[in-house]
Amino acid sequence: MASRMGMVAIMSLFVYAIVVPTSVNANAWQTDDKPGVNRNMEMQQQQGGFIGHRPRLASFNRASNQEGDRKRTVPSGPNHKHNNIPSHTPHHPPSYVQALYEDDRTITSPGPSKSIGPPPLPDRY
């Protein structure tokens, strides 16, 4: 009888521990007139705070304040300081990749006489 009363007490505490925090959390996410808005978020919006990443705004004032409001000169052509590839060479894969495709007839699979595997162990006996 005592064990049954103990089990009832434990089960009632267990149910209470599950139900009460769930209802408190449900009420915390609702305000008086705006359901689904957290009070902390609402307070931050009223105080002028922001949430998340704030993007940087571009400023074009410095470029226009240069000498006489003229455009900057931009060099044309490849930048030899940072680019070591000559501008007259075409960009293609290295020659060893082309050799694999040109020389397909010389590639043969190993025959039964050539075994693929680890090298034989030296005799240590």
From Swiss-Prot:
GO terms for cellular component: apoplast. The modification Hydroxyproline is found at residues 75, 78. The keyword Signal applies. This is CLAVATA3/ESR (CLE)-related protein ESR3. One of its GO terms (biological process) is cell-cell signaling involved in cell fate commitment. GO terms for molecular function: receptor serine/threonine kinase binding. Residues 45-125 are annotated as: Disordered. Glycans are attached at residue 78.
